[in-house]
Structures are given as C-alpha cells and as structure tokens.
Amino acid sequence: MADQSGNAAPPPVRRRSSANYRAYATEPHAKKKSKISASRKLQLKTLMLQIAKQELEREAVERRGEKGRALSTRCQPLELAGLGFEELQDLCRQLHARVDKVDEERYDVEAKVTKNITEIADLNQKIFDLRGKFKRPTLRRVRISADAMMQALLGTRAKETLDLRAHLKQVKKEDTEKENREVGDWRKNIDALSGMEGRKKKFEG
C-alpha cells in the first residue's frame, strides 16, 4: 500500500519463530579473521616463555650469590693450625658466646615482627569498624503479634487510629440459637400447612 507521496511502504518486519531463532543460533557463522596469524601467535608465546625462563634463572643466580656473600662475611674460616688445648677452649667459648648473641638478636627480631603483625591486625580492624564492615551477629526469629507490630511502628497512635477487630462483623451466639429454634423440623411445618397432619395420625393409629 503506497502512501500519499507515492513511495511504497516498507514490508512489515516478521518476527523469527523459536525454531528459526534456534536454528540461526546453532548454525556456524563466519568468524572474523584475526590480524595475527596462528604461527605468529605461537612464535610470540614461545619468545615470552623463553624470556620468562631467562629471568627466573638470573634471579636464582643472584640469590645464590647474595647467600654466598652473606655466609662469607658472617662465617669466616677458622684457623686451627698450631693451636693448643687452652686456645681451642677459648675459641669454643667465643663461638658459643657468638651463638648466644645471634639467638638473642633472632628472638628480638621475632618479637618485633609479632608486635608489628598484631598492630597491623588492630589497625585493619579499626578501618573495618570505621567503614561499617563489622561482623553482623546472627539474629533470632521473634514472634510478634499484629497489635504489637503496629504499636512498634506507630507508637501510641496505633490503638487510636487502627483497631482491626472493630471492623469485623460480630455474631452473637444467642442469635444463632434463636434462628435454629425458629426453623425447627421443616417436615412438621410442611404437614401443618398442607393439612396432612391429621390424616397422618389416623394411618399411624
């Protein structure tokens, strides 16, 4: 159907059915070609692995060198040639004193590290408290009535504004018993109205 300007109206857009959409989603589509070829990617990965391996080897060599230098400065070789018995005893006493000193230093360092760890934990806890990220306690489920809930929400106005029982229809027990007495036995009422009550007594007698 053409509009007033003479141009043809575009065809209505047809919605894909579920089967067609499923087929369209599962069928293979042409993938975009990447700018780097597969062989180039493999070459780059291999080069990166080689560089990482060289860096690890260099770090290991540096660690071994630092360890050797530290041991050479702290553990000097002993000169035991030409020493007598008393001199050897003096050397042993010196070595024991040095060991005791190193143990004291190690103990002091461990105490400082423990103190720093405790202070860091306290500071982190203070930060969490300031941000409000404290551990919430587990809440217990408490049963509460509707009146208590409304009173907690509205305060003293709860009883004045909302009285849920006042809108309910009240049925008295006396009214129900009165209705039952008025209805009685429906068969007797029908016999009395139709005049069949006397004839029924003759047949029964």
From Swiss-Prot:
Q: Name one GO cellular component term.
A: troponin complex
- Modified-residue entries (Phosphothreonine), positions: 26, 46, 73, 138, 176
| Organism, as annotated | Equus caballus (Horse)
**Similarity annotation:** Belongs to the troponin I family.
Q: What is this protein called?
A: Troponin I, cardiac muscle
**Ranges for region Involved in binding TNC:** 27-74
The entry's keywords: Acetylation, Actin-binding, Muscle protein, Phosphoprotein
Annotated function: Troponin I is the inhibitory subunit of troponin, the thin filament regulatory complex which confers calcium-sensitivity to striated muscle actomyosin ATPase activity.
Q: Which residues carry this modification: Phosphoserine?
A: 5, 17-18, 37, 39, 72, 145, 194
Q: Name one GO biological process term.
A: skeletal muscle contraction
Checking InterPro entries in the record gives: Troponin, Troponin-I_N, Troponin_I, Troponin_sf
Which residues does the annotation list for site: Involved in TNI-TNT interactions?
75, 92
Region called Disordered, residue ranges? 1-38
